[in-house]
Each structure stands twice: as C-alpha cells, then as structure tokens.
C-alpha cells in the first residue's frame, strides 16, 4: 500500500506552492531599482524587519511623506477636473519616465497656478454676483418706492439715508457720492433699506425685523426672476428682494445688524427714476465686462487642467509605485556600514530563478560595482499559503478563503469545490428552465468580460461579475439536475421518449385516485413525466430526493476524511492516521455508510423494506430477526459486527493518541531518542508562525490539555456524524420547496389567468408569473441555495480535514496597488 501511494503523482493543484525564505543584501545605489524590478515581477513577499520602529523613525520616512504630499496634489487636480466637468483621456503615446524630484516641482507649479486662478475666479464671481444682485434690486425695489413727495428734499433724505452693508458693491460708491448730499439730513422722516436675501431665510428674517422694531416697520418683498450662483458651493440659489420702511436712527442700526446676521446684502436704490436708469446702465456695463473676463478665465483654467489631465493617470501610477517602493525599502534594515540594505522575504520556490535574474538586471542598469547577494535561508516559521489560480478557479478559491486560509501545504478544498459546489447547488435548484435563465445571465457576463473588467462596477454587479464562472457552472449543473427531475418551470416534458405508464381507460378519470399502470420499460433518463399529477407524486419524489441527499452527504463526508488521511500522510503524522483517520472512517461507515448501502440495495432490488425500522432496531434490538425488512442474506450478523465496530471506534479515537504523545515526549526528554517531533504530532493547534518540519517545538507538554482537546474532538465527531448527515437533508428540503413554488406559480397564477378570455387578465397573469419567477425563484431561491451549499462545504465537508489557520501570500507587486 505504501509503495502504491508513493508512486502516485504529485498533486500540484491540491496543495499550495512550496515557499522559500530568502535574504537580499542590496547595495544602496541599486536598492531603489532592485525593489522596483521586484515590484514589477510581483513574486516576493517582504518581511518587516523594522516592526519595532514607528513610521517616522524609518530610513525613508521623508520620501514617503513627499509621495503622500504629491498624492494629495494629484487628488486635488482630479477633483478640480471632475468639478469642471472635463473629460481628459490619457495620452496614447508612451511618456518617458520622470524623476520624482522633477514631478514634485511640476506638481507644485501646477497647483500654485490652479490655486491662483481659483482665487481670482472666486473674487470675480463674488463681484459678479454682487453686481447681479444690485441689478435685480434696482429692477424689483423701484416698484415699492412710489411716493407722493418727489421734491428735492425727499430725494436728499432718501439718498442720504439709503445704506448698504460692508459686503456691498464698493465700485458704485463714486456714483452714489455724486447723488447724495452729505450736508443735509432729516432725522425724523421716513427711511428705507433695500436688499436681497436667500428665500429659505426670508420667514425668520421678517419675523426678527418685526420683533426688533416692535412692529414699527413696513416690509415688502418680491421674488427675483433669476437664480444666483453661490461661489462657495457652485449651486444656484433662489433669492428674494426686500424693502424695509422705518423711521429713526435706532431702528436703522437694528435693521442693519439683523441684515448682517442673516447674510442679507443691502444695496442703495435712488428714488429718482432717472438716476435708477443711469445706475442700471452702469451696472449692466460692468456685468458685461465681468462676464467676458470670467469666460476668459474659465477657458484659461480649463486649458491648464486639460494639460494636467492628459498626464494625470500616469502621474498617479508613478506616485503610487514610488510610495510602494519606499514603503518596502522601509521594511529593510540598514547595514551598520550604511552601504547596503538587508531584506528578508518569502517567494515561491519556482520563482527563485526569475528573482535572481531580475536582481542581476537591476545591478547592471544602476551601474553598481557590487551585485545583489541573494541566498536561501533556513525557514523557522510557517510559510505563507500561495495558490496559483486562473479566472475559473479564483472565485472558488475566494469562497474557501472567506472561511479560512489553508495552512501551508494543506489539502486545498477549492479543487474539489469547483465540481461539488455547483453540483450541490443544482441538487437544490434543479429546474432546467431556471437553469437556462442563469446560463443566459452567465453568458452575458462572459461576453462582456473584457469591457466590464475595465469599468468601475457597483458592489452587487462587481460580486456577480467576479463569480461569473461560478454562475456558469451552477447553471450547467442546474440544467443537468433539472433534466433528471424532468422540470421546466415545473412542467415535465417527454424529452427522452414516451412514458412507461398509461391510464387504465381512455378517459383517465381515475388516474389520480386509482393510479396508472406500467406497460413498457422505464423512462430512460430522469423522472418519468407521468409522475406529474399522480396520487403518488409527492411520496415518490420525497423518497427519491431524501435518499439521494443522504447518499451525496455520506460520499462528500467520506471525501473529507480521505483528504484528512492525505494531510496526515503528507505531514508525516502517523498518529493521526492510526488513531484518528481509521476510527473515524470505521464509525462513519459502520452506521451511515451501511445506511447508504441499504438505500442502494433497496433501489436495485425493489424491496419494500422499511429502512427506518432497520436502523432504529439495529441499536434497540440488534439480535432480533429482521423478517420482511431483510434485504440480503447475512444482514443481521453484519449489523451486529458494524455496531460493535462503531462502539469500538469511539474509545479508539479518544484514548490512544494522548497517551502516545505523552510516551513520545517522555522518551525524547529521557535521552532514549533525539528525533525531532513533527509539530502536528505535538500540538494539535499549530499557529501560523510556528515551526514546521525544521524547528524544535519548545512549548511545555500539557497532557491534561491534550487529553481534553482529544475528548472534545472525539465527541464533536461522533455527534457531528449524526448532525452532519441530517444537515444534508437540506438538499431534499430546498429541492422540494423550489419545485412546489414553481408549481404554485405555474398553476395558480399562469394557468389560472390563462383560463379567462379577457386579454387584460392574461397579460396581468403573465406579468405576475414573470415577476415571481425572476425575483423569487431566480434571485431569492438562487441566493438561498447558494448559501446552503456554502454551509455544506464549510461545515460538513471542510470540517473533516481543513484547519484553515494559515495566512495568505501577499507579494510586493505593482499590479496589486
């Protein structure tokens, strides 16, 4: 047996890549180029040799800080380009590599230029808004200034007392000074203040004015015809023009303070119509000049942003790469002579030649007199886990890694999940009509794979696109299982020939009550379509799917135990084989393997034996005669033997292994043997950074802890054998639920609506059926079957052999940043 196992080929996909711990001694002059080339290769994971230092104490902290500042500037440029609504496609021609210092100076110049243009534009926009508000106030407030007194005294009072706030339009002061007579003031006449305010503040503003003046004021307001842009948010704001009439200096002071508090802008409006027109013309002239200036400034700013945008993508990539390089250099140690850097890391064994060639090229390109020293170190800690995947296997590997990363060189469940996962999903989802819908969705994702891979997708769409090959396999297996169940949207078809059953008479009036009669050979593939609608349809399908679920569950659990044997053999743990794998196989198959055998024999012989009675009385009365429940000769003595083996297997799992470990430990420290214990035989829970195969396990041996752990493990397996077998009955339950839901929607919605002559009712029935099929059967049921298949793999299958306490291989790679 050992010779046969040794001759088996290496299972490369089953286990993670062999890893090697390497050390690099890099001269300072070639360090940057060497790390850059290694990042392009992406097959070396560096260890942090400066973990005890803060980020500010590391050698290249200043360079990392400079890269961070450049990243901030690039984000600023990107925000400005997006805010301006520009679409800058990157240059197609290859740009020459730019030095970090030159790029830093360019970014500083561009940022200074853009900030200065933004500042000027903001000032111009503020001035433009004030002029625009002044124009609106002049147009709207003139309607409120109707007075019977149009003499010079009234004008002088109005012009002298009209007030505007500090943030008013200053350039109009020269015209107003010409209009006003500072030498004359009427302290007892009626005055007014005109201005403009945001519409959402109007109600509170009016209420505050009323309370402050105790009602001694007249408030008039009208909505402006055009919205005004807010310079701070660049949003259009609706504003309202107001005119407040009052009397007295004290009221004037209060009103101005309230206007300032509410952000209302006050503007002087002359009462004379001629002066209003003169002032309006002056404001319109200045508005026209400012519009031309703003348009020219916007064009200049967009041209500057376009020149940055053409190279923005390349600059972002360059800065990210440089920052990643310096972050990696900070993980290396400076030699005491300050002439070289020392680094350590993990790489796949197959990549050593490639890494060596890359380091030689870096030495040549940097014109260094001393080459990089690259040599292999003796591994003490457990290496990282690295699986090479493709587009098909990557999604399944991610599903397994979501539960736990495999221990180094541990059997990889993802290899088997590529087939078992979509198949168990299909057992629960089996309907080849629904499977075709899933297949169309998967084919759409595959057809647009190249385009969708370059787009930024939403979280849901990204999840679907990442699992496109999983969906494809689930659809194909669903079509296969649907053909076995003979269900197309719950409707059976005579695809593989005619039925083996027929009615007792031509009317088929007693088909459901009395049943059909068999008149030819069985239906060649899958369930006979005549079972549909018969009186034994549900008992037949229940029995079929329940027994099939048990068979599939026992087969997958046995596969998990077999993988635990290969794990133990690979790591050289003979104790796990003798005292764990063998009794577990005996216990599981003595009970549930025997049940699977009975199911197959009953199917093959057509026996009417009650398997529930057989299994129950196998424990209660093992020596009792089976009578009509006997399926084969010698069944009763076989049951007694299997029952005894199951009882023997429990203490076999529990007692020998802890005592064997204790004996090995005592012999080791008494000097009778000096062999190094394999870690899996000493500690049942190996940490990811513990020694494996090359290091000495120095932890104190605690027999009571080992014994309690083995006791828990044994009890968990014994109870889990029952619960896990029962858990696989979810395959039967969800398959039945999916089938019955499909039947209800087909018969109670589609057929019921189709029975009416009204075309509207038929259309409503088709719409409801399509909605229920799409959202309940194709979305909710798909998600439900997906999660149940996930549970069966994580708990029932992987729980038999998978430790999942490893850590991922995360190489330094530019492709991952």
Swiss-Prot record:
One GO MF annotation is: proton-transporting ATPase activity, rotational mechanism
Which residues point to the Vacuolar side? 444-468, 569-580, 661-758
Cellular component GO terms, alphabetical: endosome; Golgi apparatus; trans-Golgi network; trans-Golgi network membrane; trans-Golgi network transport vesicle membrane; vacuolar proton-transporting V-type ATPase, V0 domain; vacuole
**Keywords carried by this UniProt record:** Coiled coil, Golgi apparatus, Hydrogen ion transport, Ion transport, Membrane, Transmembrane, Transmembrane helix, Transport, Vacuole
Q: Please give, as recorded in its UniProt entry, the membrane topology of this protein.
A: Multi-pass membrane protein
GO terms classed as biological process: proton-transporting V-type ATPase complex assembly
Give the gene symbol: VHA-a1
According to the record, the segments passing through the membrane are: 423-443, 469-489, 548-568, 581-601, 640-660, 759-779
Question: What binding partners and quaternary form does the record give?
Answer: V-ATPase is a heteromultimeric enzyme composed of a peripheral catalytic V1 complex (components A to H) attached to an integral membrane V0 proton pore complex (components: a, c, c'', d and e).
Q: What is this protein called?
A: V-type proton ATPase subunit a1
Knockout-associated phenotype: Lethal.
Show the coiled coil region(s).
Answer: 97-133
Organism (species) = Arabidopsis thaliana
Localization: Vacuole membrane; Golgi apparatus, trans-Golgi network membrane
* Family indicated by similarity: Belongs to the V-ATPase 116 kDa subunit family.
Q: What does this protein do?
A: Essential component of the vacuolar proton pump (V-ATPase), a multimeric enzyme that catalyzes the translocation of protons across the membranes. Required for assembly and activity of the V-ATPase. Required during cell expansion.
Ranges facing Cytoplasmic side: 1-422, 490-547, 602-639, 780-817
